Amino acid sequence: MAARSPSVVISDDEPGYDLNLFCIPNHYAEDLEKVFIPHGLIMDRTERLARDVMKEMGGHHIVALCVLKGGYKFFADLLDYIKALNRNSDKSIPMTVDFIRLKSYCNDQSTGDIKVIGGDDLSTLTGKNVLIVEDIIDTGKTMQTLLALVKKHKPKMVKVASLLMKRTPRSVGYKPDFVGFEIPDKFVVGYALDYNEYFRDLNHVCVISETGKAKYKA
């Protein structure tokens, strides 16, 4: 079994960046504490993850499975980098995409009650190298549920790439194969990560403020 790819570890006392140093939509000005991971850093890290993925999975047809909705930005950017590597390689491989939607959050807590929406026919995964792309691993329960579903279809290989992984006492111990950033136990939004469907339109990963939580609470 291949070793997991290393990640960028962000410490518990990471101060982040002042909002005034970046372009933040005015309608979120009072709803955020700080910029936690700037967009440019996300993109550079994603480019390296693409290389790690191709090194480990690039010998066979890859099915990239996007976990909606939060994973769509990371998924699109990661696949752009993978496709660039693929078309410039002497040993390019076919790649197809599929989508599944999971829901496990109410407000800022993972409920543990995981709903699978879509993915009714995942028979196309049989015999393929499957790359599941997720925005964030919190407790890990959601991904364990999805992995059990995917493995029923007997793929050749299953790997998980997540932009973020939280250090949290609620974790069940699951760790993905490819991680962009390991972060403290803070509720983050932006770059398609949401709080009750808000904040997906932020370019950066930011820490939500108590004002923001109260304003957009379900």
UniProtKB/Swiss-Prot annotation:
It is found in: Cytoplasm. The keyword NAD does not apply. GO terms for molecular function: guanine phosphoribosyltransferase activity; hypoxanthine phosphoribosyltransferase activity; identical protein binding; magnesium ion binding; nucleotide binding. GMP binds at residues 69, 134-142, 166, 186-188, 194. The modification N6-acetyllysine is found at residue 103. The modification Phosphothreonine is found at residue 142. GO terms for cellular component: cytoplasm; cytosol. Its cofactor is Mg(2+). CDD domains: PRTases_typeI. There is a cross-link at residue 115 (Glycyl lysine isopeptide (Lys-Gly) (interchain with G-Cter in SUMO2)). It holds the Pfam family Pribosyltran. Binds 2 magnesium ions per subunit. The magnesium ions are essentially bound to the substrate and have few direct interactions with the protein. It catalyses: IMP + diphosphate = hypoxanthine + 5-phospho-alpha-D-ribose 1-diphosphate; GMP + diphosphate = guanine + 5-phospho-alpha-D-ribose 1-diphosphate. The keyword Cytoplasm applies. Its EC number is 2.4.2.8. Pathway: Purine metabolism; IMP biosynthesis via salvage pathway; IMP from hypoxanthine: step 1/1. There is a cross-link at residue 115 (Glycyl lysine isopeptide (Lys-Gly) (interchain with G-Cter in SUMO1)). Belongs to the purine/pyrimidine phosphoribosyltransferase family. NCBIfam families: HGPRTase. This is Hypoxanthine-guanine phosphoribosyltransferase. It comes from Bos taurus. The lineage of its organism: Eukaryota, Metazoa, Chordata, Craniata, Vertebrata.
